[in-house]
A protein has these predicted regions:
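Intrinsically disordered, low-complexity acidic regions enriched in Pro/Ser/Thr
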Residues: 27-145, 149-168
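Bacterial N-terminal signal peptides that target proteins for export
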Residues: 2-13
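C-terminal motif of bacterial Sec signal peptides marking the signal peptidase cleavage site
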Residues: 21-22
């Protein structure tokens, strides 16, 4: 093998591999599927975001009653697990209650530590981070709801749905 052949042979092999690789009919998936489950939950810990979550526009919430919320706190993993273990008790009022995504806000009210639930359906590709952003929707009916959970009594109260869609 002469010197010229030794230099050109590797270049020719690389070019041939690139051409053949471009002609292949086997392709990988256009996108990688994710296995996110429905009904995810996030604890909101920043007070300014917590106040925004409670500032609902088409349903009553503790944050809309002047002076009712005296402070915020972060529910523990155990308290969130306790709440989520009881969610199915709302199934009669909220069909498929476990399919809703939820934000949890710890509120202090009348000397009690309660957890406010803001429930919604978040699109998979929304780019929104419910742990750091308030999810606020006006109208929407039963697709958006809120409730209060009392960890001390293990009960829900104040279940409220958003108002209906406006217009004729």
């Amino acid at each position: 093998m002469n010197r010229c052949t030794r230099l050109l042979l590797p270049k020719a092999a690389i070019t041939l591999a690139a051409v053949l690789g471009a002609c292949t009919t086997t392709r990988g998936p256009a996108s990688v599927p994710t296995a996110e489950r429905t009904g995810q939950s996030w604890v909101v810990t920043r007070p300014i975001i917590a106040a925004q979550v409670l500032d609902t526009c088409s349903r009553p919430s503790p944050g809309r009653e002047a002076g009712r919320v005296s402070g915020y706190w972060a529910p523990s993993r155990q308290q969130v697990d306790q709440l989520e273990a009881r969610l199915s008790s709302l199934e009669a009022q909220v069909p498929k209650v476990l399919d809703f995504d939820r934000q949890y806000v710890g509120i202090e009210s009348a000397g009690k530590r309660l957890i406010y639930i803001n429930a919604f359906h978040l699109p998979d590709d929304s780019g929104v981070n419910p742990a750091r952003e308030a999810i606020r929707v006006c109208d929407g009916g039963a697709q958006f709801w809120g409730a209060v959970f009392d960890p001390a009594s293990n009960t829900f109260s104040e279940l409220q749905f958003n108002g209906g869609f406006g217009g004729p």
